[in-house]
Amino acid sequence: MSADGRSGRLRFTKMHGAGNDFVVLDLRDGTPPPDAALAAQLADRHFGVGCDQILTIEAPRSEGAVAAYGIWNSDGSAARQCGNGARCVAAWLVRDGIAQCERFIIDSPVTAHAVERLEGGRYAVAMGMPQFDPPQIPLAGFAHARDEYALPVHGDTVRFGAVSMGNPHAVVEVGRVDAAPVERVGTLLQQNAAFPDSVNVGFVQVVDPTHVRLRVFERGVGETLACGSGACAAAVVLMQRCRVERDVQVSLPGGELRIRWPCDHEQVVMSGPAVFVFDGEWNG
């Protein structure tokens, strides 16, 4: 068990994927997932353990999967997709002996993901098919998918691509990612009525056709050192515009990810590191 109901203690593992950090809880014994207040308390970097998201390991939901996982943002809200988290869950399952093959399946809140164990502590995860249709993102006010959308925001016009990778993303191409107004524009887009479920906002700079730089302002978290689904979103939006090749390196503040999308009718595959930091016990 991860939770000791008699004492209030909670055992956990701290992990990160390219700097996107997680508190991982083993709930396969049926222990209830954290409520919003507990998730926010655990994620607090001053009064809790500290992380971007909480990951809960649970019993599998689909045939053939070895386990499932839930995702909780640092503000206590539930999330539906987390690419860096998927790699960390995969590594945790391998370390615990639950996943014993080089290839296996895990269930996220939105779908089943095929995972491949690579060399050097890296994992590849099939992230599903990108959805560009506005109702699927969801993006209100647009009937058909476009390469670029424009929204008036506080007197300015913000131009962006939009896609769902199991969660909504807006992708803003910039000349210099270091100078991008990440928090200001990210917050304005998240609060815009065009995104009824809010949105993760990526700011991407094309270095060359095989390399981009990216910063992501995540809903429920803020700017993170890395965002796996955000890296997928930025890559596929640029691929649709023929700005980059179908196999691209994404440099984020916390590390490097590789995104491959062989063709429009195949799944996006993300690969990158999964790192164990420490195991601990939270006393509540």
Curated annotation (Swiss-Prot):
Name of the top EC class for this enzyme: isomerase
GO biological process, one term: lysine biosynthetic process via diaminopimelate
Gene3D superfamilies xref list: Diaminopimelate Epimerase, Chain A, domain 1 (3.10.310.10)
Gene Ontology CC: one annotated term: cytosol
Similarity remark: Belongs to the diaminopimelate epimerase family.
Organism: Xanthomonas oryzae pv. oryzae (strain MAFF 311018)
Active site: C82, C227
Catalysed reaction equations from the record: (2S,6S)-2,6-diaminopimelate = meso-2,6-diaminopimelate
Cellular location(s): Cytoplasm
Record's protein name: Diaminopimelate epimerase
Residues the UniProt record annotates as site (Could be important to modulate the pK values of the two catalytic cysteine residues): H169, E218
